[in-house]
Amino acid sequence: MTYVPDNALYNVSKAGVVTLTKTFARDMGKHGIRVNAVGPGSIPTDLNAALYADPQKEIELCNKIPLGRRGTKDDIANCVLFLASEESSYLTGQVIYAEGGWLLV
C-alpha cells in the first residue's frame, strides 16, 4: 500500500480497508467465512478520466507501471473471481494488489 500526497482522507480509507479485512477474517474464520480484499491500481473510470485525458500524462503514468499499462475492469473482475472461487479456499485476511507492479516502484 502507498499513499497519495495531500489526500489524508483517501489514505485513511485505504488503510481502513486493510485493517477491516484482517479483523473480519480473524473474527469470521471460525464460521468458515473467508474475507479478502482487492487493491486495484490505476483503472480507467469515470472518476479519474479527467486526470489522464492528456495522452502525454497517460504515457507518463504507464511508464511508471512495471507492466507498462493501466489495468482494466476485467483485470479486477478476474481477481475478484479468483478470490470467490475454491482456488483461493485457503486465503483469508489478504489484500490482493492488482496494480501491474505499481507498488514496486
Segments and roles (model prediction):
Residues 1-16, 21-30, 43:
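Catalytic loop of short-chain dehydrogenase/reductase
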Residues 18, 39-50:
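Short, flexible catalytic-loop segment of classical short-chain dehydrogenase/reductase
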Residues 65-76, 87:
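A conserved structural motif in NAD(P)-dependent oxidoreductases
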Residues 5-6, 30-33, 54, 63, ...:
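Short coil/turn segments at alpha/beta junctions that flank glycine-rich nucleotide-binding fingerprints
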Residues 49-65:
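A short C-terminal helix-loop "cap" of Rossmann-like NAD(P)-dependent dehydrogenase/epimerase domains
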Residues 102-105:
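Short hydrophobic/aromatic patches at helix-to-coil boundaries
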Residues 29, 34, 91-93, 99:
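Short, small/polar-rich loop/turn modules that mediate ligand/substrate recognition or access, typified
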Residues 21, 77-80, 84:
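Short-chain dehydrogenase/reductase
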